[in-house]
Amino acid sequence: MKGPFPAVIQQYVSNPKLFDNTKRKFDLRIYVVVFDMEPLTAYIYNEGLVRCCSKDYQAPNVENCKIPHIHLTNSKINPSNSSSSSIEANTQNTNNKKATPAVEWENQVLVDIDDDTINGTLSSIELNKENSNNTTAVDEQSNKFLLTSWLEKPGNVESTSDFWKQVHDSVAATLLAIQPTCALMYNTCFPLSDRRENNVCRSFQTLGFDFIPDADNKLWLLEVNNNPSLNLDTRIDHKIKLPLLENIFNILSQT
């Protein structure tokens, strides 16, 4: 797109799935860690963030298209909206039940992306992880929620296996698309012969894949963030990001 600055035009998802018992649009942040580009070596973390808008969804029109709290799920935008706390109240009041208890970290794995993954078969590496502190699946200080807790609620997805297959297929296709260019740049900095001789990982990159689910449970890749925030702004951030970093360095210690 020509203009005063580079821009990308995306088709707006006109039938977004709305969060649980609320009328809020949301997205899903999935973390992917790339350790090598030749051969392509990457992992998907199977815990993530559900990030909600803080105003009820409305189909875009001339009047509301400039109201970010309706259409943009970015967590940096929505905490500034004073109505954000209502999501947490609506979530906990559904069927007069409390939020889903926090999951145990020993069940979390990083899933390896390899040729089998592209064909729909997943391989995983179990790593040692400590139990998290008593953190609920809902953070009342923000519009963030645990992905696994959302997946466990009936009706949110047709099946978790189908959900993760969509994620894996999208991540694999994205990484394969950028692999030739990234491999060239990577090999310029770290010659392949040197890497094989020393058998070490020279670098890694954490990516944030953001998906918008629609009303038919199809995942749409919104963007890939090459520098996702690892700030620990909320309790949910502590619960997700600290084990993620622990897993990354555990894998690095094995390479």
Language model features with spans:
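A short beta-strand motif that forms the metal-chelation/ATP-contact edge
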Residues: 211-213, 219-226
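Glycine-rich phosphate/pyrophosphate-binding beta-alpha loops
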Residues: 225-233
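Catalytic core of tubulin tyrosine ligase-like
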Residues: 1-206, 215-216, 234, 238-254
